[in-house]
Amino acid sequence: MSSITKTIRLSGKAGGSIEDAVRTVLARAATTVSDIQKFTIVKVGGEVDDSGAPTFFTVTLDITFGIKDPVEHG
């Protein structure tokens, strides 16, 4: 685990539940970011159909990951 971290903010949505939306955002982040250590839910929202039932849940996450230590050459 790196002693230096960086935090990025990402948003995404999924049908089903807030948890599904969180998992979707984290899974997508993991395809390009390594050493994800934690997340914080910053905002939760959603979309509804004509009857008022939720159709999608939207989340905004702060995702923290470790920064790789420099490699010493020599």
Language-model segments: which ranges?
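Flexible glycine-/small-residue-rich
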Residues: 12-14, 43, 61, 65-67
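C-terminal structural segments of small proteins and small subunits
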Residues: 51-74
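Short, conserved loop-to-beta-strand elements that form functional interface hotspots
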Residues: 39-47
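Short, well-ordered alpha-helical segments
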Residues: 2-39
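Amphipathic alpha-helical hairpins
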Residues: 4, 8, 45, 51-55
